[in-house]
Amino acid sequence: MTETQFGGDEYDVSVSVSEAAVERALDVRPADVAPASSLTFARNVFVPLTTACRYTCTYCTYYDVPGEASLLTPEEIREQCRVGADAGCTEALFTFGDQPDDRYTAIHEQLGEWGYDSIHEYLRAACEIALEAGLLPHANPGDQTRAQMATVADVNASMGVMLETTADVQAHGGPRAKSPEQRLHTIDVAGDLGVPFTTGILVGIGEDWRDRAESLLAIRALHERHDHVQEVIVQPVRPNARWQGEPPGAETMRRVVAMARAVLPAEVGVQVPPNLTDVRGLVDCGVDDLGGVSPVTKDHINPDYAWPALDELSAIADHAGVPLRERLPVYERFLPADGGTADDGWVSQRIWRAIEDGDRYEAVRAE
C-alpha cells in the first residue's frame, strides 16, 4: 500500500496517510454525507494574552511586530474574565502568537518583572484567574513542546492548535516559517498528555485538494492513536489588512466540509466559524458545531468579521430544522459519567471540581 509520511525525527512525530484513503477523500461530495442532527456552540470570552509571535504568516493580522506587541496585565485578564462570567460565558479562550522569540525583548522583560520565567508560566496564572472567575480555560498557544503543554494542561478544560495544512505553503514562508511537523507534534503531545483537543485546517492559503485531504487524514490518524480530538475546524481565510487573496468560494467550502465529515470519526465534531462562513449553505454538509462565540468580545484573530449574535445562531439552526445547544469548551464524552470522579474522565481534578461546583456549567450540560 502506498503511503505518505508526515513528521520526522526532528519533532519526534510520524504520521502515515495511505494513497487509497486520499483517493476516497477526494471523491467525497456534499451529497455523500448526512446533515447533523443538532448544532452546538460555546459561549466564550476571548482573551488575547499577547500579540507577540515568532511567525509572520502573510494571512494573519493577529501578530504585532517587536516593539508594538501587547501583553495583558493580570488586572486586565481578571476584568475581561469578570465581564465574560457576568454575561453567562463558560469559556475563557486564551490565545497568543507562537512562543515569542528573542526579538520581543519588552515582552520577556515585562514577564520577568512580574515574576514569570516564560509565557507558559504566565498562561498558567491567567488560567487560574479564569477559574477563580467561574470560567473554564481553553488555551490555544500555538506550537508547544511536551514540557510547555504539561505546564498548563491541568488548568485547561481543553486546548487547541490549528494544523492549518500539512503542506509547505508560501503563506508560511520567510525566515521564521511555520512548520507543519511542529503542529503535528503538538497535536500528538496533547494526546500523549490526555488533553481534549481542538484542531483544524485553513482553506485558501495556497494548499490544493490533495493537501486538504492529507491534512484531514493526518488529524484522523493522530486521533485514532490517542482518541483526544474533540472537533476539527474548517476555516476559510478571508481578506484582511495583510491578506488580499481570493477567499474560497461556496462550492469549495461545501466540498471541504463534506470531506471533513466523511474522513473524521463520528465522535469528532466538524466546526465552521459562523463569522467567516455562510453556515446556512454548509449545514447539510455535516457541520455540527459553530465553535466559541462571544457576546462580549470580538474575534481578535479575525477582527474585521464580527461574531453573529446568539439569536442569529438560533435562526441558523431553525433554518436547518435542528436544535441549537450550548456546550462547554470540553465535550461531554471527555467528562466522567454521572457519579464518577476525575479519575474516570480526561480532565484534571481541578477542572472537574470547577465543573461540578458551577451552576452555569450544570445548566449547560443539562441542555
Swiss-Prot record:
InterPro entries: Aldolase_TIM, CofG_family, Elp3/MiaA/NifB-like_rSAM, F420, rSAM. SUPFAM superfamilies: Radical SAM enzymes. Its EC number is 4.3.1.32. Disulfide bonds: none annotated. Pathway: Cofactor biosynthesis; coenzyme F0 biosynthesis. Binds 1 [4Fe-4S] cluster. The cluster is coordinated with 3 cysteines and an exchangeable S-adenosyl-L-methionine. It is an enzyme of class 4 (lyase). Its cofactor is [4Fe-4S] cluster. Pfam families: Radical_SAM. Residues 39-275 form the Radical SAM core domain. Keywords: 4Fe-4S, Iron, Iron-sulfur, Lyase, Metal-binding, S-adenosyl-L-methionine. [4Fe-4S] cluster binds at residues 53, 57, 60. The keyword Lyase applies. It comes from the Archaea. It catalyses: 5-amino-5-(4-hydroxybenzyl)-6-(D-ribitylimino)-5,6-dihydrouracil + S-adenosyl-L-methionine = 7,8-didemethyl-8-hydroxy-5-deazariboflavin + 5'-deoxyadenosine + L-methionine + NH4(+) + H(+). GO terms for molecular function: 4 iron, 4 sulfur cluster binding; 7,8-didemethyl-8-hydroxy-5-deazariboflavin synthase activity; iron ion binding; transferase activity, transferring alkyl or aryl (other than methyl) groups. Belongs to the radical SAM superfamily. CofG family. Catalyzes the radical-mediated synthesis of 7,8-didemethyl-8-hydroxy-5-deazariboflavin from 5-amino-5-(4-hydroxybenzyl)-6-(D-ribitylimino)-5,6-dihydrouracil. Consists of two subunits, CofG and CofH. This is 7,8-didemethyl-8-hydroxy-5-deazariboflavin synthase.
